[in-house]
């Protein structure tokens, strides 16, 4: 899945996949338990961005368990590189300006910045619009929302086009700043 998606993205911009710059590691243990192995790869390959999908699995326990969440953040910070962790939010959240990851409040509180990704997609359509909303930033002002129209050409390519998030009625209701 990851390789196919990366090929689609690179085809969408007319470029080759930079294989020497991308690494994928399937994890079978909590992030904190595997930190020495992860650190070794980060150091050996000079990795400057680690993407953790998903944060709940990386914590190694219940998402409401503050010990597991704190362990994840301590391990992540020990790498001394940028970490992007992907977490889910509760679907029933009525207060759109206070959207936070489900589980322990530590997911939101310990993060340096939080961005929410929402999308509007019709069934069986090869395109959708996604909005990216800045919900939290330590030592920085909140940023305006961004939006992209994403278009799929079968398994061949994926293209992203900048668009106005306020122009989509569904996504307009999710915006952090107008």
List the model feature ranges, each with a label.
Residues 1-67:
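Conserved inter-motif catalytic segment of the P-loop NTP-binding fold
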Residues 49, 67-157:
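Phosphate-binding/switch region of NTP-binding enzymes
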């Amino acid at each position: 899945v990851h390789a196919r998606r990366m090929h689609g993205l690179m085809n969408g911009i007319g470029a080759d996949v930079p294989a020497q710059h991308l690494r994928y590691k399937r994890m079978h243990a909590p992030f904190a338990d595997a930190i020495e192995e992860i650190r070794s790869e980060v150091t050996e390959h000079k990795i400057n961005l680690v993407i953790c999908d998903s944060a709940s699995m990386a914590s190694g326990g219940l998402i409401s368990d503050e010990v597991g969440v704190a362990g994840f953040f301590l391990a992540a910070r020990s790498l001394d590189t940028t970490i992007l962790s992907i977490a889910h939010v509760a679907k029933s959240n009525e207060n759109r300006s206070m959207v936070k990851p489900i589980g322990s409040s530590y997911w939101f509180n310990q993060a340096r910045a939080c961005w929410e990704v929402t999308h509007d997609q019709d069934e069986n359509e090869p395109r959708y619009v996604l909005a990216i909303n800045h919900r939290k930033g330590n030592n920085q002002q909140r940023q305006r929302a961004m939006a992209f129209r994403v278009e799929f050409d079968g398994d061949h390519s994926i293209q992203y086009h900048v668009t106005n998030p306020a122009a989509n009625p569904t996504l307009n209701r999710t915006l952090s700043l107008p």
